[in-house]
Amino acid sequence: MYEGAVQELIDELGRLPGVGPKSAQRLAFHILEADPQDMKRLVEAITTVKERVKFCTVCGNVTEQELCNICRDPRRDPSIICVVEESKDVLAVERTRSFRGRYHVLGGAINPIAGVGPEQLRIRELLTRLNDGAIQEIIIATDPNLEGEATATYLARMLKSIGITVTRLASGLPVGGDLEYADEVTLGRAFEGRRNALS
């Protein structure tokens, strides 16, 4: 264990998601050895993002304005909303260039072990968006893990009573994958999500 400022830096870096003790130590020593101007730019970038970036008042995506660029874009279809867990998921969907609707960022997923229930997510804001009657379909695009599935099921059951079409992203076998290596859940989902071979 180091002393003083070095250990404090390692500890703070270790609090970042996905950064373990070894990575935190490597990052800390990289910072110590880096050019001071590079570190000044890093500090300025972090400070700027904390000062200027906020969440879109409509969808919850990151933005520097009141509304994000997707909510401001009149070419987007306002009748379809893709519900995702985090802002980074918006970017992942956008990279596909397959979706031209709008988004709703929940800010996480239901995770009782971590103390995250529906009330900690932006579900109330989603329901508010549905009040105007313009939305015809909700696409649930949560992660295909336990928390994402719990969140998707919760949303689907809740939205079913409203009478809006609720769909879930298909999941199954990856392109180029081998059946023999697929786990049972993935293979089962592939069967459930099968479609006409000629469509």
Curated annotation (Swiss-Prot):
Keyword Magnesium: no
Lineage: Bacteria, Bacillati, Actinomycetota, Actinomycetes, Micrococcales
UniProt GO molecular function: DNA binding; zinc ion binding
Annotated S-S bridges: none
Gene source species: Arthrobacter sp. (strain FB24)
UniProt cross-references to PANTHER family, sorted A to Z: RECOMBINATION PROTEIN RECR (PTHR30446:SF0)
Zinc finger (C4-type): 56-71
Chain's role: May play a role in DNA repair. It seems to be involved in an RecBC-independent recombinational process of DNA repair. It may act with RecF and RecO.
Domain of life, per lineage: Bacteria
Keyword terms of this UniProt record: DNA damage, DNA recombination, DNA repair, Metal-binding, Zinc, Zinc-finger
Annotated Gene3D superfamilies: 3.30.60.80, 3.40.1360.10, 6.10.250.240, RecR Domain 1
Family membership: Belongs to the RecR family.
Pfam assignment, any one: RecR_C
InterPro entries: DNA_Rcmb_RecR, Rcmb_RecR, Rcmb_RecR_Znf, TOPRIM_dom, TOPRIM_RecR
Name of the protein: Recombination protein RecR
SUPFAM superfamilies: Recombination protein RecR
Domain Toprim: 79-174
GO annotation, biological process: DNA recombination; DNA repair
